[in-house]
C-alpha cells in the first residue's frame, strides 16, 4: 500500500476541498527536503488520506468489484489485513505480541477481528486498491510497447517477524542465520 496513489482512486474525487488540500499539503511535506525516499514519512503522509477515502465507502460496480476481490483472495487476504491491524496495536514483530495473538487461528484473533472489523476492512481495501493500480500500470506499460509490461521482483525469503511467517508459520523454517540476497547477474 505504500506505493498506492490516493489521487487516482476514483472515490478521492468525492473528498471535500479541505480534505484534498490537506492531502496535497501532506504529499508536498513528505517529499520536501528529502534526498532519499523516506518510506515512513511517505506512509504517514498517505495514511490519513487513504483512511478518508476508505471512509467514503463504495457504490455499485466498485463495491461488487471489491467483494469479488475479497472472495477471490479469501482467507489469506483476511489474515494479512488482520496482521496489519494487529501491528498497529502490538508492533511489527508478531513474535513479541501477547501469545493469544501469535497464531491467526487463535480465538483471540477472531475476537480481535470482530472488535476491529472496520480497520481490518481498511487493510483489505488497501490491497484491492494496490492490485487495481498495479494492473493499470501493467496495462499502461503493455500499451506503451513494453512487451513484458512491468517486471516484478520476487523476494528470496521472508522476515520471521512479518505477515508471511505469522500466517504460514508452520510452513516456514525460520533460520537464525540470514544473509543478504544474491546479486543480480547481468
Q: What does each of the following model-derived ranges do?
A:
Residues 165-179:
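Extended hydrophobic/aromatic segments used for targeting, binding, or gating
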Residues 46, 185-186:
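Basic side chains
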